[in-house]
């Protein structure tokens, strides 16, 4: 049983590790997620935010009544907001305009003053979120600018807490640690600690296209041609933060914006983990290099933050489609029935005369009907089978149960259109979707329309 805490800051850390099951079924070894959204600010950044503040207090750089100023993707700002509230400081955050509206709204809700700055400018441009924070720090008396990128308390926080937790939770069996890299604090702090326990542990960093990390790690060259705008939030950089200890990192893998977004949604559907954008990128990067793993390995992937910060982005179908991330092939059963989910399913019983089924088909302009018996699916009929029966038995005395075929397959709302199309291609005229207490039907024509 947990104790009673004196304040919210005391709940930071000691986050759970959760085995990934369905989404990692093709891996040769177990994969465990260190889920950092269980921190009070819903991200891993709570750890280092508190560490930076407490260090500044100890050094006398942050004095009572002072102002904390930080450039952030949102999560560090939230951690600093918690510290500012408990300790009595004012907080000003600068964010780039690519960050989600939810992040900005959350910071303001926590009492922070927020400056939104353009993304597509150089780091030293006066309007960049780095430069604006620097300017405010110079202009505002008694202010403290942690600058998480170069503040080594960032990685020290993970060396002191996150790393030991992972080692203890896996009982020292961890062989690979995988995490998205932004400021570099998490991978460097955790990596240093784990390699001190076992030098053979591999540390893999996940990068994004438009970032400099991977090429710099491989060539030791800072290539500005690697820098271009990207959508992924929380990982990748156009600078080399001092917190990134490239000697600790064994390998970098890059992930596209699209693949990271799709993996984020997949983790929610398959594992019940409602995660942030970079978490999907971290898992996708691991999945891309799973062939490097063996059955004897134990992998830990760290998931940075919570999905509530991305409701209007990766979890919004319109946002995904506008960026080409959610093609027709990524639709699921729910998308196909949305237009007619309010309509009742047309059915017949197996004891009805075939003429009743023919009348319903004509009335509703349909070509197939599920057959029910006491509320249970027992079969199906379609216009082809009906025509054959009418030709062979003109008296129309045939009952539905005498000519019905097998019941249509039943899927859930999250079944992909690709899987449904395969069922229809394999000979089924339609598929039923479980919807609340009843069902809805997806026909061959519905699929053709969705894919066209």
Descriptions of predicted regions:
Residues 346-365, 371-373, 390, 410-429, ...:
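The conserved cystathionine-beta-synthase
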Residues 385-401, 447-452:
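A short, polar/charged loop-to-alpha-helix boundary motif
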Residues 61, 376, 437-438:
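Residue-level signal for well-ordered, solvent-exposed loop/turn and beta-edge residues enriched
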Residues 379-380, 439-444:
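Short glycine-/small-residue motifs
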Residues 248, 330-345, 397-408:
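Bateman (tandem CBS) regulatory domains
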Residues 1-335:
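PLP-dependent amino-acid enzyme catalytic core
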Residues 48, 52, 337-341, 361, ...:
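Methionine-biased hydrophobic packing positions in alpha-helices, especially
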């Amino acid at each position: 049983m947990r104790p009673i805490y004196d304040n919210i800051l005391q709940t930071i850390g000691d986050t759970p590790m959760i085995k990934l099951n369905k989404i990692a079924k093709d891996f040769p070894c177990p994969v465990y997620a260190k889920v950092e959204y269980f921190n009070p600010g819903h991200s891993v950044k709570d750890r280092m935010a508190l560490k930076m503040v407490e260090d500044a207090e100890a050094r006398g750089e942050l004095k009572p009544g002072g102002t904390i100023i930080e450039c952030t993707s949102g999560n560090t700002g939230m951690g600093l907001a918690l510290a500012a509230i408990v300790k009595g400081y004012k907080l000003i955050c600068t964010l780039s305009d690519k960050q989600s509206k939810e992040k900005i709204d959350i910071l303001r809700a926590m009492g922070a003053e927020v400056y939104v700055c353009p993304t597509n400018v150089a780091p030293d441009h006066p309007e960049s979120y780095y430069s604006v924070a620097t300017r405010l720090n110079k202009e505002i008396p008694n202010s403290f600018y942690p600058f998480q990128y170069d503040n080594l308390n960032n990685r020290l926080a993970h060396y002191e807490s996150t790393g030991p937790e992972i080692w203890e939770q896996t009982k020292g069996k961890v062989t690979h640690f995988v995490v998205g890299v932004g400021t570099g604090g998490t991978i460097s702090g955790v990596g240093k600690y784990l390699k001190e326990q076992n030098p053979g542990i591999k540390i893999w960093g996940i990068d994004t296209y438009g970032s400099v990390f991977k090429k710099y790690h491989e060539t030791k060259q800072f290539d500005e041609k690697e820098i271009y705008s990207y959508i992924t939030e929380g990982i990748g950089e156009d600078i080399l933060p001092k917190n990134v200890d490239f000697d600790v990192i064994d390998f970098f893998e890059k992930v596209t914006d699209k693949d990271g977004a799709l993996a984020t949604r997949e983790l929610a559907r398959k594992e019940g983990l409602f995660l942030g954008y970079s978490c999907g990128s971290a898992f996708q990067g691991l999945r891309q290099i799973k062939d490097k793993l063996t059955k004897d390995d134990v992998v830990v992937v760290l998931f940075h933050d919570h999905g509530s910060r991305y409701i209007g982005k990766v979890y919004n179908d319109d946002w995904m489609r506008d960026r080409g991330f959610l093609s027709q092939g990524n639709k699921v059963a729910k998308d196909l029935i949305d237009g007619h989910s309010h309509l009742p399913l047309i059915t017949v019983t197996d004891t009805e005369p075939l003429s009743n089924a023919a009348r319903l088909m004509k009335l509703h302009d349909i070509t197939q009907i599920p057959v029910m018996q006491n509320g249970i699916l027992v079969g199906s009929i379609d216009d082809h089978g009906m025509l054959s029966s009418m030709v062979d038995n003109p008296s129309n005395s045939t009952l539905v149960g005498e000519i019905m075929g097998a019941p249509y397959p039943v899927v859930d709302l999250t079944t992909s259109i690709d899987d449904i199309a395969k069922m229809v291609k394999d000979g089924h005229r339609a598929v039923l979707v479980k919807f609340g207490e009843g069902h809805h039907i997806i026909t061959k024509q519905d699929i053709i329309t969705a894919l066209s």
